[in-house]
Amino acid sequence: MEQEILRVKNLKKYYTTNKGLFSGNSRVVRAVDDVSFNITRGSTFGLVGESGCGKSTTARTILNLIEPSGGSVEFDNEIIYNVEDNIYLSKEEMRKKRKEMQIIFQDPYASLDPRMNIGDIVTEGLKKHNIAHGNDAINIAKEFLGLCGLRGDSVNKFPHEFSGGQRQRIGIARAMVLNPKFIIGDEPISALDVSIQAQVTNLLIDLKERFKLTYLFISHDLSFVKYFCDRVAVMYLGSIIEVGDSKELFNRRLHPYTQALISAIPTSNPLIRANRIILEGDVPSPSNPPNGCKFHTRCKYCTNICTEQVPELKEVDKGYFIACHNWHKIN
């Protein structure tokens, strides 16, 4: 039986914002709203959706970089936090756990401190976790920079001396030196040129196989997710609306929103382009979402129940989940 390394249950992150400059009224922004999924050890899990749907907030809340409003996260059979039961790892316990749970950030320009040389950037985690210092730490940094396709003498250079693709490789090396079990990639290739994206993707695949890693990848690029991920969850306005094995989800695409996303993947086939699904209307504000199904304002299959009841994420086949009242009629 495949073992789950990460369990996310009913995760919530809400923000309270003032309605206006001089108004005492406030609104609750449900950035992450009752999100649940599990990730199998050694697999790659993709979380996809339009910009602003809550993907990155979900990733940071899982790592406890952002304080959760509700729900629980369990990593490697240990509870990271359970808000309802008031269970949290201490700061020191969380610091140790982060050695096993790393993140690769989206922007390779903003994620590296321009005042630090590459040696200091890559060895910072080694020193903080008291794994290695001095020349020992530098040698480890050189080893992982080499695995990521960079020269060992890169340790003496500064971020401005590298291209975007090289900087992202440095960010990957920084995550890898701590020998993590689990890595979150927050849009790790979206800021790179197309030619470099393929190289970095192949590097991530090689590292996964070599070090038996588990990945959670955040992306709005479905062609990348289809190629790279074993399972995929589709997110809309803070909630997950469909989850399944990658190949099955791209073939079945039961939810109307998933259908629209997949139809928007660029293709040279004119027949596919002619059948592209164009969604009407704008994404509602997360501070004022519609009643019932959050997608009903843009869905051509909307019925009365969609405007009144929030659809539950239900398992409709083994390992396949969907949150839609009318999925069986649509398909």
What are these regions (language model features)?
Residues 50, 188, 192, 196-274:
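P-loop NTP-binding/switch modules centered on Walker-like glycine-rich loops
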Residues 177-181:
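A short, proline-enriched helix->beta-strand linker immediately N-terminal to the Walker B motif
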Residues 4, 18, 22, 245-331:
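Charged, flexible cofactor/metal-binding loops and thiol motifs
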Residues 63:
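Helix-to-loop junction immediately C-terminal to a conserved catalytic motif
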Residues 79-82, 136-153:
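Conserved ABC ATPase "signature" region
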Residues 71-84:
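Conserved ABC transporter NBD signature motif
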Residues 158-162, 166:
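Conserved ABC ATPase signature
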